[in-house]
């Protein structure tokens, strides 16, 4: 049986799900159902990224710990999919023909990511170094040099100067193999 991998964008549970969340998941669900009808073994995933400054600030504003805050918001996403008639199973459960919902704070997910990063670092594909730049918490993105030195070039909110240690993946090491493959 042919395999088909499909994923929605990963959602940030700093607020309730919205029409954009519903739209992208419904479109992917339609495609997953179609591919199953065509005989594909479909792996259909979605989930929440439960880390970051935006989450910490939203939790603090709500008077909750980040873990309490995201647990409540995660349930809203799952309920939305159920209301839309999309069969969903929350990680690590995996029901056949369902949308697998994975969240980044699940201990199994954290262990898997740690194993992957350790292996990549051992092979020289990940290194740790200091990064300095302007960051927009609202958009959760670093801002390119050469734009407004004070505000985010997308939302217009003030950007923060950030200096921190980060891990960098050497994607350039895979450029030629990827070009050869595709």
What are these regions (language model features)?
Residues 1-182:
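N-terminal, positively charged nucleic-acid-binding surface of large information/translation enzymes
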